[in-house]
Amino acid sequence: MAELEFEKPVVELRNKIRELKDYTKNSQMDFSEEIRILEDKLENLEEDIYGNMKVWDRVQIARHAERPTTLDYIEHLFTDFFECHGDRLFGDDAAIVGGIAKYKGMPVTVIGHQRGKDTKENIRRNFGMPHPEGYRKALRLMKQAEKFNRPIICFIDTKGAYPGKAAEERGQSEAIARNLFEMAGLTVPVICIVIGEGGSGGALGLGVGDYIHMLENSTYSVITPEGAAAILWKDAGKAKEAAEAMRITAADLKELGVIDEIIPEAKGGAHRNVLKQSENIDLMLRKTFEQLNGISKDELIEKRYEKYMKIGQVSFSNASIWIK
């Protein structure tokens, strides 16, 4: 498993414990006490490092090559998944996957960004950066879900929508804007979960919902820290400083009222235990569906509208203003 710079002391100690256990198996010597001491030390070290992570550490975890993807969670959370392809206008976009499935026996529509696990798959899926046809495919599935009264679950994990010439020629901005407009008025429940990077309009194209949740180490921002640093200071190398200033973590966005709940992760990130992470998401989905139960279609749209109107409202003394 790939290690990140900030967690090297933890990885080194884990390896040392593993080596000592392997040596014990092949020798007559008993190192159980030494192993116990090292395991206690490891527990304290993990608590110290993972309990005091900086924003840049979380950015690295959100981008981890082995971090679970939309298809990983579909495999663990849903049954009878049937993937649908194409936008019926131009083609299919592998950077967004979607289809119908069952969650606890309930028919649902599941849509999400999909990046690759290796170079070949990343190229096929364009590193999880969708073209317009990806967003139009997603919208087609959302309108289908509305027609058949199926709740929608969206998994968000992208650096952003693809900014290439062909994408712009096919109407990238219109496709995202159309999704924002249509998602705001859907008459079925929409639950959005940021599972990795939530990058700019590319994330928002799947991100208008009744409830917005984030995994503990995911990020959500208008631009990458590198991009912000390049614009503000003409130096992408200042990405760490930009990340601190941008308030892009789940804790920051919960405090600001942009998201609803934070889904806990295993120490070191979701990639450490995909099954456990799926269970944590499952708990949040069950809780969210309970909160949505019994809400009429009109009330659903009204609450969704009120939710987004509150974002950006701040108070100075007793005066309330809107940030335009």
Swiss-Prot record:
SUPFAM superfamilies tied to this protein: ClpP/crotonase (SSF52096)
Q: Which domain of life is it from?
A: Bacteria
Could you say which EC number(s) this protein's record lists? 2.1.3.15
Gene Ontology cellular component terms for the protein in this record? acetyl-CoA carboxylase complex
- Reaction(s) catalysed by this chain's protein: N(6)-carboxybiotinyl-L-lysyl-[protein] + acetyl-CoA = N(6)-biotinyl-L-lysyl-[protein] + malonyl-CoA
Query: Chief subcellular site?
Result: cytoplasm
Q: Which UniProt keywords apply?
A: ATP-binding, Cytoplasm, Fatty acid biosynthesis, Fatty acid metabolism, Lipid biosynthesis, Lipid metabolism, Nucleotide-binding, Transferase
The residue ranges of the CoA carboxyltransferase C-terminal domain are 37-291
Recorded hits in InterPro entries, A to Z, give: Acetyl_CoA_COase_a_su, ClpP/crotonase-like_dom_sf, COA_CT_C
* Molecular functions per Gene Ontology: acetyl-CoA carboxylase activity; ATP binding; carboxyl- or carbamoyltransferase activity
* Key word Lipid metabolism present: yes
PANTHER family for the chain? ACETYL-COENZYME A CARBOXYLASE CARBOXYL TRANSFERASE SUBUNIT ALPHA, ACETYL-COENZYME A CARBOXYLASE CARBOXYL TRANSFERASE SUBUNIT ALPHA, CHLOROPLASTIC
The record's similarity note reads: Belongs to the AccA family.
Q: What is this protein called?
A: Acetyl-coenzyme A carboxylase carboxyl transferase subunit alpha
Q: Which organism is it from?
A: Bacillus anthracis
